[in-house]
Amino acid sequence: MGITVMARIDNYEQRFGGIGRLYTPDSLARLRQAHICVIGIGGVGSWVVEALARSGIGELTLIDMDDICVTNINRQLPAMSGTIGKLKTEVMSERVKLINPECTVNIIDDFISPENQSDYLNRGYDYVIDAIDNVKTKASLIAYCKRNKINVITIGGAGGQTDPTQIQIADLSKTIQDPLLAKVRSVLRKDYNFSQNPKRKFSIDAVFSTQPLIFPQMTEGCSTSATMNCANGFGAATMITATFGFFAVSRVIDKLLKKKS
C-alpha cells in the first residue's frame, strides 16, 4: 500500500475517529461507504449536510438551485457576507471538502420536480433526506421514494418556533402541529393512494415540532395570508432549523447502521 493511500486512511481516521469510538469502527466504515442525497440546502438542509459531512459520510449528492440571499443569514449555514449571491450547493460542497477531503460531493443544480425526480432519485442512494418546503413537490418525492423502495425521511416546517425540546420524529401519518406535513399527508392520500385510515402508518419518518406556531406581527398593508408568502413570513432561528436537521441525520445514521449490522 502506497504512502499516499496510507496517509489518506490515517487522515480519515484522525478526523472521524470520534465517530468510530462512539458507534464502533465497523459502523464508521459503513458510514464511509454510504451515499446520501440531501434535497433542499436551506435553513434545515444546510445543517443536514454539515452533520453528514462531520459524521464521515463517504458520498453526498446535493440538490438545489437557489443562491444565497442576505435574508438567509439568520438560519442558513453558508450565508455570510462573502457568500451572498453564490449557489448554496457550491458553497456547501466546498465546505464539505474542507471537513472531509475524500468525500465525493455531487451537485445537481436544479430543483427537484415530478418531471425530473426519476432521473435524480435513481442513483443508488442509501438514504434521501427531504428538506424542501413545497407541498406538491414534497408529496411527489415521498410517493416516488415509497413506490421505489428508496429510504427517505421528510422534514416539516421549522419556521415560527423557538423551543427545540419540542422537536421529535414520528411516522408521517402521526405528526401534529405542522401545517406543511398536514398538507403533504392530504395530497398523499388524495393523489397517491396512501391509506385514508388514520390508524395506518405511512412508514415514512418525519421530523416535526409539537410547538404551536408563532405568527409574525401583522405588517401594515399585508394580510395574514400574504404575510406567510412574502419576506415578512414566519421568523426562524438557527437553534430550531439546525436541530430539525440534526434530528433527521441522527435517525438516518441509526437506520443505516441497524440495517447493515
Swiss-Prot record:
Protein name, as recorded: tRNA threonylcarbamoyladenosine dehydratase
Record field: transmembrane: 230-250
Compartments (UniProt record): Membrane
Cellular component GO terms, alphabetical: membrane
Entry-linked PANTHER family: TRNA THREONYLCARBAMOYLADENOSINE DEHYDRATASE
Topology relative to the membrane: Single-pass membrane protein
Keywords annotated in UniProt: ATP-binding, Ligase, Membrane, Nucleotide-binding, Transmembrane, Transmembrane helix
Single GO molecular function: ATP binding
Function noted in UniProt: Catalyzes the ATP-dependent dehydration of threonylcarbamoyladenosine at position 37 (t(6)A37) to form cyclic t(6)A37 (ct(6)A37) in tRNAs that read codons beginning with adenine.
Family: Belongs to the HesA/MoeB/ThiF family.
SUPFAM superfamilies recorded: Activating enzymes of the ubiquitin-like proteins
InterPro entries in UniProt: ThiF/MoeB/HesA (IPR045886), ThiF_NAD_FAD-bd (IPR000594), Ubiquitin-activating_enz (IPR035985)
Record keyword Transmembrane helix present: yes
NCBIfam families per UniProt: PRK15116.1
Record EC number: 6.1.-.-
Protein species of origin: Haemophilus influenzae (strain ATCC 51907 / DSM 11121 / KW20 / Rd)
Signal sequence interval, chain numbering: none
GO biological process terms, semicolon-separated: cyclic threonylcarbamoyladenosine biosynthetic process
Enzyme class: ligase
